[in-house]
Amino acid sequence: MKGGGKALWKDENIADSITAHAINFIRDNQNRPFFMYFATNDVHVPRFPHARFRGKNPMGYRGDAIVQFDWSVGQLMKALEEYGLADKTLIILSSDNGPVVDDGYADRAEELLNGHSPAGPFRGNKYSAFEGGTAIPVIVSWKKGVKGGRQSNVLMSQIDWLASLAQLVGARLPKGTACDSEPRLGNLLGTDSQSRLWVIEQSSSHVLSVRTPQWKFIEP
């Protein structure tokens, strides 16, 4: 790793650091369109939230990390409000996989779940081909373009976001770019309930599966 002292970090300071950088980015770009990807370390292991969040949740460090993540999102929302961008900013909150509780760190995450089921009604978790590993939550907020208070079970894939966001801003993707990304802006905005015909998925052990709106086939 290069960079000397500037390349060093403490896990408990990651949330504060990336949140501050994100707020500065919003401030510096408030007068022009921008795309910002905010990839938080919460609740990824090792889970080591800042001291001011420890003990805030009965689920131990994992719960505290979720509280810390909630704080980061709140700070970004406040920044958008402060700079007059809240009404015209499309916000997508999601995950890159299903939940994992015990990932090799002795932080008592399993013991302190207190009846909470991170994958909801689904079987499996992050590494699995079952829905618990591949079905992820998506929250979309855009005061100018999304009617709130609704839920959707429409089938789409995160790979569709590239084509969908290009569709939103009127951009044409170069030929051969993201050929498996479908423009499904209506699904994101809640104006179209037509699902994708199918999605190909793969687990960490390279097990392939095909998901349709009604069925899921996992290779034997």
Model-derived features with residue positions:
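Active-site His/acidic residue clusters
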Residues: A22-D64, V100-D102, A106-A109
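C-terminal cap/loop subdomain of S1 sulfatases and analogous C-terminal strand-loop tails that border
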Residues: P99-A129, V146-P220
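Solvent-exposed, polar/charged alpha-helical surfaces in well-ordered, non-transmembrane soluble domains
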Residues: A20-N24, V67, W71-G74, K78, ...
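Short glycine/proline- and acidic residue-enriched helix-loop micro-motifs
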Residues: M1-K10
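Active-site-proximal beta-strand/loop segments in catalytic clefts of secreted hydrolases
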Residues: F38-V43, F48-A51, S94-N97, T134, ...
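Loop/turn elements at helix/coil->beta-strand transitions in domains of secreted/extracellular proteins
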Residues: N29-M36, L85-I91, A135-I136, Q194-L197, ...
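Metal-dependent active-site segment of extracytoplasmic phospho-/sulfohydrolases and closely related
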Residues: F69-A106
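Soluble non-cytosolic domains of exported or imported proteins
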Residues: W9-S17, G60-V67, S152-I159, A178
